[in-house]
Design a protein with these regions (language model features):
Chain A
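Residues at the starts of beta-strands that form the adenosine-phosphate
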Residues: 8, 33, 120, 147, ...
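Internal alpha-helical scaffold of NAD(P)-dependent oxidoreductase catalytic cores
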Residues: 142-227
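Interdomain hinge/lid region at the active-site interface
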Residues: 211-280
Length: 302, 302
């Protein structure tokens, strides 16, 4: 069943995610007008020039006039300020959703500032992205086959949740639902912590006196392990701040794992090390076969 | 200056590295006969069938008769036993080299068992590999543009070091020299530790009650961060055991870095986190531009 087109879509934060959502709905013939709003006038002008948005709004009053759907897609640290600023201008029927990598803080902002609007404020998180950021990298096909996690509120009207789900499905995405607490714990483990660990390794090496020498001999294993250390610092600062309790819990769990491996190394426990490595390898290979078109396979190249 | 062909090359451990060395020298017209030796008869037969080796030797006496060059390319944990076993059958002029990812243990084995042969026993480490292992994955082009680190002994005859260097150069490799201590410290930092960290993360998640759920939401950042967790457990067990002191030192350094980041998270220190992330990103991007044809770029996709 095809969902009906959005008359006016407002995208706050026209970067990779917001821009791709706009382009995907345009490609599907499911949006008549896209209005961009954001803190950077320059990036709104680029989005306009690229046809990602049809119009840039000067303020929330202008942006929200006649808006049917609003997607919040700026770094998660801005959520509360943005929700607070938009709230007074929101018409009763406008559907609000977001694309933040963390959910508890988004929900807190909704409860704080959208108290009368909770029927139509549906938190979401598309598990998609690319190496690039900014609206120049926006791509109508970005969400094809990717998961979008919705964490609906008890107050949400079922029709609003369905509408958000259908719009993402029209972008090619697969919908999952979770509680916000569960969402934030799961992504702390499989996404936020790995980012922190990769940043930590590169930072550690880069600050050494012999950093030049170390980097000269780093090869393909290092390349892949640290690829996410080139991620956007502000975005990841925000994720770390808003989800810091779950990330700390995951970090502490990981430190226990490292303490265990450290003991195996200290005691030169070959069978113990091989068992850990073999279990990890089996789990990684099973994951690769099941969840990704893992063209590059797994394994070392050093 | 083209180096002269090797009359008879012996490869111990005909896997990805040993097999690729044989194929590369064959492709360059620089070897007349390749003799394989190893603990697995089945893998020697596959290497024979694939034309990676010309003959499989039943024992070291047979393998070393008339051998001009020997490459040791089995997992590093076998080095001492292999060197001990070959020593009695080694003719005075035969050149011995190796491809181990660690060097101090190889040198210890040379000093222990090749006391009269040190002029011609040259330790080396090709920084190359691929996702696959085994002689089926052997590839004549594997070493093109890759570094090979030699860690010559004071006892080495300059002509022997030059000969080893020229053979690797004929495979397309770039030669570097380092002390074995420096080699083992550098690779503990940029290769061995990242492997341990990736194994640790996957092992940690795989052992949880909700492992299925966690893996379901893992995406591209996790894929690349953990690719090396699919590496060969025996090979990495051996590397961890023989280089455990350097790896422990690197692990402890990394644990200090994580303690620092943990403190930033605990205190919700946004500027501090952003500074670490921004420094890491700058270093990772500079590395990507300088050292790799980093087609995939860096950055997050979550």
């Amino acid at each position: 069943m095809k969902t009906k087109p959005v008359g006016r879509l407002v995208v706050c934060g026209v970067g990779l995610i917001g821009g791709s959502f706009a382009l995907a709905l345009k490609a599907a013939g499911l949006v008549r007008e896209v209005v961009g709003v954001g803190r950077s006038q320059a990036s709104l002008e680029r989005a306009l020039a690229l046809g990602v948005i049809d119009r840039a709004a000067a303020d929330w009053a202008q942006a929200l006039a006649g808006a049917e759907v609003v997607l919040l897609a700026m770094p998660v640290g801005q959520t509360e300020a943005v929700v607070k600023a938009m709230a007074p201008h929101l018409a009763p029927g406008t559907l609000v959703t977001d694309a933040g990598s963390t959910k508890r803080n988004v929900i807190e902002a909704f409860y704080l500032h959208l108290g009368g609007h909770l029927a139509h404020a549906v938190p979401g998180h598309p598990i998609a992205g690319a190496e690039k950021s900014g609206c120049e990298a926006a791509d109508a096909t970005l969400f094809r086959g990717r998961k979008v996690v919705l964490t609906p509120l008890p107050e949400n009207e079922p029709g609003s949740v369905l509408r958000v789900a259908q719009l993402w499905q029209a972008c090619g995405a697969i919908i999952r639902e979770m509680s916000p607490q569960e969402h934030d714990r799961v992504f702390a483990a499989v996404s936020h912590l790995p980012h922190v660990l990769a940043y930590a390794l590169v930072h550690d090496l880069a600050e050494r006196a012999n950093a030049e020498q170390l980097f000269e001999y780093a090869a393909g294993g290092f390349r892949d392990f640290t690829r996410i250390a080139a991620s956007h610092p502000e975005m990841w600062r925000d994720i770390c701040l808003v989800n810091r309790q779950a990330i700390l819990a995951e970090l502490d769990q990981y430190l226990s794992e490292l303490a265990f491996i450290r003991a195996l190394l200290l005691s030169a426990n070959g069978p113990g090390l091989e068992e850990v490595f073999a279990k990890a390898r089996a789990a990684r290979m099973a994951w690769g076969e099941r969840y990704v078109n893992d063209a590059n396979g797994g394994g070392s190249d050093e």
